[in-house]
Amino acid sequence: MPERARYLIVDGHSVIFAWPELRKLQERRSSLAREALIKRLRDYQDWTGMRVVVVFDGKGAHIGASSDPHDVQIFYSRKGQTADAIVERLASKYGHRFELMVATSDYLEQQTASACGAECISPEMLRGLMQQVRACARR
């Protein structure tokens, strides 16, 4: 049986507010925090080969997404919708088709994603994984 593609789905603001250095950037300007997180996730994707999807709460009329298929996929929720809802929908739609890992501090979101077959980790666990991978990549 072929190996299923691996995806990491990240609740962007959940991670930003859990990591002190990103929270500090968020206080200055939210775009700085988002860009710093995306850069780290891009590195993680490059090092591991695991595809990364990051979801942020947005303000627009529709769900926005990045267009480069080889880059980190970035989604913004539409007005009146939360990033949580998008993460849950992605887990529901793809949880049994792909190997999913969901990074969020939201307990309900973790429960929903887990019920859909995803492995759930906290932002702190994500930080640890990223540090381990970075250390191995530098050797």
Question: Can you say where each PLM-predicted feature lies in the sequence?
Answer:
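Nuclease catalytic cores that cleave nucleic-acid phosphodiester bonds
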Residues: 2-10, 14-139
